[in-house]
Every structure is written in C-alpha cells, then in structure tokens.
UniProtKB/Swiss-Prot annotation:
Induction: Not induced by auxin.
Name of this protein: Auxin-responsive protein IAA16
Organism: Oryza sativa subsp. japonica (Rice)
Coiled coil: none
Described purpose of this protein according to its UniProt entry: Aux/IAA proteins are short-lived transcriptional factors that function as repressors of early auxin response genes at low auxin concentrations.
C-alpha cells in the first residue's frame, strides 16, 4: 500500500486537536502568572493568619448585672468616711465617750456612766454616789422619792441623803465598787492604773461588802501586782 503523504498532516491535526482540548490558557504565560499570584496570595494569607496574635480575654466576664452594680455603688457610698471617730474626739475636746452600765444591789434600776469624762477613781466614785444616792434612799424610805429625783438630776443632797460610804475601801465599807473586765472577771475598782481600768472595764457594779467573794479580792490583788 502506498503512502500518500497525508500521515504527517493527520498527525499534525490530531496533535493540534489534542492541544486544543487542554484548558484555555493552560500553557499561556498569563495563566501561569495568575496561578502563581493566586498561590502566593494564599501563602500570604496563611502566613498572616498564623502570625496573628490570639484575642485577649474579655475583662469583666461574665458581665455583672445592673442591679449588682447599683448595689455595689450604693454600699460604697454609704460607708462612713474615715476619721469619723477622730472627728468626734476632736469635737469633744480629744475624748471619746466610754459609757458603761452601773448596777447596785438593792436598786432595780441601772444607770450609765462615762468613764472618759472622769480623771480618776475619786471622780468616778463621786459620780456613782450621785447616781445611786437618792435611789438607794428611796428604796429604804418611799417618802424620799423627791430626793431620788434630785439626785438623778445631779443636785446636791442634804439630810438623810448621805454619801455611799466605802465604795473604794476594798470591802471595809458598807458597799464596794467592782467592775467586770474584758476577761469576764470581777475586780475591785482601784487596783490597776486608771488608764488600764478604762480600757478593761466593761461593767460596774456596787455590791454589798458582805456579799463580796474572797476570790474577787484575791484576783484583784494578783492583777494589781502584775500591773505594778
């Protein structure tokens, strides 16, 4: 069979057909450049995503409700200003009131006395005497109610309104003034220095000397020796 010389032409046509079946612009320079730029952009995007810092945690999370914020602000505004005690002390001449309860045997009514308002045991004894002198007389004689009112008002008393003797005599008089300290012990008034007494006294009581316990006197003597 003779070759007609068209084989080459058919081969060329088939080759051109195969080339034409490829994707448009696959072998073109513009396509290569486009693919290269797309890959570069993707790489940049990946690098940028990896290089980005993690988001910082949200401060104040979980969120506080409004009514809690209002409650916190109101509580902070209601706090008393510092130095209130110092201001009160300055207003009263540098002394802060130190009130304690005072009770007396035979008198159902208690009183209060300001320890800081007195400068020593003598003044305290006189103040307790004024508080209970008339009340004690009224307990003994109901006709002395007027005298009791006068004594409560701090007025001077005469006649049968005698002073309560022996408050600071350590049990030698009819009545003895004792106090309860911060440890709950009953102590004789006058056994320790005045400043220590003011800091430790929580309650005063006027007891009959006959009702005093010997342990109270011994405990007072021990604390007085320790203070000295």
């Amino acid at each position: 069979m003779a070759w007609n010389g068209r084989f080459g032409e058919d081969g060329e046509e088939e080759r051109s057909l195969e080339l034409s079946l490829a994707l448009p612009g696959y072998f073109s320079s513009s396509g290569l450049q486009g693919n290269t730029s797309t890959a570069a952009d993707g790489a940049k995007g990946n690098d940028g995503f990896k290089a980005s810092r993690p988001a910082a945690p949200v401060v104040g999370w979980p969120p506080v409700r409004s009514f809690r914020r209002n409650l916190a602000s109101s509580s902070s505004s209601s706090k008393p200003p510092r130095g209130g005690r110092d201001a009160a002390a300055a207003a009263t001449g540098g002394k802060v009131a130190r009130f304690v309860k005072v009770n007396m045997d035979g008198v159902p009514i208690g009183r209060k006395v300001d320890l800081a308002a007195h400068g020593g045991y003598g003044e305290l004894s006189a103040a307790v005497d004024r508080l209970f002198r008339g009340l004690l007389a009224a307990q003994r004689d109901p006709t002395m109610a007027t005298a009791a009112a006068a004594a409560a008002a701090g007025e001077s008393c005469t006649g049968e309104e005698e002073a309560i003797a022996g408050l600071l005599d350590g049990g030698s008089g009819e009545y003895t003034l004792v106090y309860e300290d911060d440890e709950g012990d009953q102590m004789l008034v006058g056994d320790v220095p005045w400043n220590m007494f003011i800091a430790a006294a929580r309650r005063l009581r006027v007891l009959r000397s006959s009702d005093l316990n010997a342990s109270t006197i011994r405990a007072g003597s021990r604390k007085r020796a320790a203070a000295e």
